[in-house]
Structures are given as C-alpha cells and as structure tokens.
Amino acid sequence: MTMLGAALLLASPSLPVLSVAMLDDEVTQPSPGQEARALSLVWPSDVKLVLETSPYEVVVRFDRPIKDAMLQAFAKDAGADLADLRWNDNSLVIRAASGRRIDASAQGRTLIVHFLPESQDVAAPSLTPSPATPASDTELELEIARAEADAAAGYPDRARRRLVPLAERYPDNKRIQRLLGDMEVAEGALVLGATRYREIAADDPFARQAMAEAGGNIMAAGTIRGGKVFSQVEGVLNALVPVGRNLAVGAGVRHVRSKADTVLGPTGILTDVVAHTTIADALATVQIGNTSRLELQGSAQVDEKVYGVGARLFAGAPERQARVLLAYRLPDVATPEQSTFGGHISRAGIGGTIRLTPELVLQADGGWNGYGLRGTGVRTRSIAVSGGLDYLFRRSSPSLAITYRLDAEYVNRTRLRPNGLPFIPLSDRENHSFQLVAGKSWSKWQVTGAAGWTFDRIGNTNGPTANISATGRLNDGWRLQASGGVSSISRPGISGRQLYLRVALTRYLGRF
C-alpha cells in the first residue's frame, strides 16, 4: 500500500488511489418492492476479473484498468440503486443503496451486476467460497477493501478503526499490519507507523522514508519575501529528535534581515531602515494517541531581549480535526516596526477542518491577536479570521482542484506614542482568494502549481495570486523542497503585491 500512504500524506492535491463517482442525492431511493435490474460493465480488452461479494457489496479486482468515463456512465445508469462506487487501477467497490441487495458475475471481460429488492433472494450467487477460499477469508478481503476505500477517499481514521480489530484477530497478517502502519503515518503518528514497518520488515521506498523521518531531522531553509515597501530575507536551521514513542524535542535558530521604506518610531518617521534579528527556539511535540498532538514552543529574540512561549493543540483525525492556539509574547517581526524595535505577539485562537465528502474539505480559524514592542505590552489588538474550502474535481494525472481562501483581520485598538504616531500601525484587511490548483508526480518528485486572483474588499489592492512548489527525495534520507510565487494577499501592515521564494533541505536521521 505504498501509493496509498503517499497519497494520504501529500498536503497538496495528490493522485488518490481510488476515484469516487458523484451520485445524485436528490434521486428518490428505491423501495423494496421495485423489480430487479441488471447492468453490464465491459472492459475494452481481455481482462481477468476476480469477484468477492456480500449481500450489499461487491469487490472486483482486475489486471487491466478501465476508463473513468465508463465507470461514471455505469454509476449514472445505476442511479438510485447505487449507494457508492469507488475504484483505482486494479480494483473497484460497488455498494447497493438502502433497500437493495447486490449480486455480480463475470463473463469474459464483462461484469454483470444485479440490483435486487431487499426481500428477493439471489438466484445464483456469483461467488461460492471453496475449501481453498473459506468464508472467513472472503469476509477479510471485503473488510480490507472497505478500509482501502475509506483511506483513499480521505478518511484514514475511519480506515484505521476498521483495521485495528483485524490486526488483533490476524496478528501475523503482514498486509493488515502494513495497512495499519500506513494509516498511522497518515494521521501523524509517525513513530508508531515506522515501528510497525520495522516489525514486518517493510523495505519499499515509502516505508524506508517513513522510518527515516521517524528518527528526527535536521533542516536548513532560506526564504525571501519582497514587497513594494517591506522585504525580508530569512535563514533557518533547526533540529528535532524523538525521545521515546510520544515525545520529540528540538531547537533552532532564525536570522532575519528586514528592509522597510518607512518605520514609525519614537523620534518620528524613519526611512530606508535595515534591521537584523536573531531568534532562538526550543521546540517539543507530544503525541497524544493516534490522532492528537501538542506542540510547544519557547523563543527568545536574543538581540532585543524579547522572550515568549506558545502552544498548539491538534485534536482529531485529519478528516475531522480541531485546533487550539495560545501564545504569549512570542518574538515577531511581521511588521516594519516590530522588526526594527523588537516585536512580540500574543494570540488565542480556535479552528478546525472537516472533510464533508471525498472531494470537499472545509476549514475555519478565528482568534485574537495582540501586537507589541520590546519593553511594552500589547499596543495593537485585532480579531483575525481565516477559512476556506478545497474541491477536488479531477483525480487522474494531473489532479485538479479549486480553492477559496478568506484571510481577514479587523483592528479594534491601536495605541499611540507621545508624538502621536501609532506604535504598530495596522488597518483592517479582508482578502478573498480563488485559485485553480494542479498536482502531478514525476518519479520521486511531487509538483504542485496554483494560479488565481485575490479580491481585497477593504484595501482595493486586487491582484494575482500564484505559486509553484516541488518536493523531491534525493534519496531515502534527504528531501529537497522549493516553492515560489506572487501574492496579492495583504499582510499585517503590508498591502499590495509581494513575491516570495523558499528553499529547504532536510536530512532525516532514522534508521531503516
């Protein structure tokens, strides 16, 4: 299940293992009294079809793929008889609607599917378990197929819950243990998944990479952000190592060079200001079960004596996750004034992500921000709101999705210096961005590109927003990431078009 795990882990739109037919929810479901129906699905060339059936579900495995359009046409013809249809390059799962039963048979390269009323018996079952294939084995294959379908549709937690009792019943079944490891990795329990890979002696590239990542990492990155009035160059070096199964600790250092056309200071308006900032970080991640984790951070801006702490809690599986954010005076150089005089930020926020369908994901976050400078408390307060949706409408290569993002901040208090200038001048901002996103894999590389438009409702600085990113494995222990683009999304204290470029090289420390 290497590709299955890989599809779940990619943050950008990936190439999912299984495709899903879109069904019409407005069609009236069939009643048990309706007559039986038979539909055919014909492969364009010779194929070997292996069927596994239950009263309400059919799993078909094949050695030649079938075109998506033919499966979508089959789903349309089935209409209200069909509850679910999912497929990949070598299997498909057909589930009957409520009040219906299902049976299937294979004749050469033709699959014949019968939809029957609940009360009607199946005349001639297509699959009778033989002594070589006991009923328990058939049931096991069906349950594994269900787990694979759930995982490929973007529900790794649901798949893991199916697999856990199977792993307890069949502890020596390496296929089940491998699938369970894939789900643990997809949910973020990397150490648990890597441990399971070692126990079954998995040696494929995906497993080796996961085992390498589980041992910690050292990462170096450089970022350039440029705008009309404010630009920054940032270098980062950090390391993270596991201490047991549920705890990882790390440390890092950041150096930022900032250049601002104008800065509001205690002596008036400063021009062409260049500032250098060095920040040291201490990090810890606590894994709480399979689906939750707590991230802790302590940071110090050593040249300005600004210190702070923060925490983020992620609760729940990726398909239904809640987030809580708390920060107290963490060093912050997001605005010209903060980068010049030593800035900090305090935050309290909450948010979440939910997958409504295999294609549609919603997310929303909101919170309070307090911006301050060295030697002072909060000088500017705001309420920040962000959210969006992702809709994946093409699963084959390249994958295609449309996205919407809201990025807004509403300032409710700004304190002034004795000279009448604000300590940190911020204004309301509300950005609405729409993008088309494409993703494609080449060998060891995943490339994602996005292009669209941002509407600035308050600042009226509408413009393009586009980016391209590439992530690749140089080998099992090294990863290279590069991304760049243009953004018209206004940031705190900065509006207008901005360019950015980021390159990161990561060395993973785990053994495999």
For each feature predicted by the language model, list its residue ranges.
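Residue-level detector of intrinsically disordered terminal segments
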Residues: 1-2, 21, 422
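Gram-negative bacterial Sec-dependent N-terminal signal peptides
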Residues: 1-14
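Gram-negative and organellar
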Residues: 126-512
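Signal-peptide-cleaved, periplasmic/extracellular N-terminal interaction regions immediately downstream
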Residues: 12-135, 139
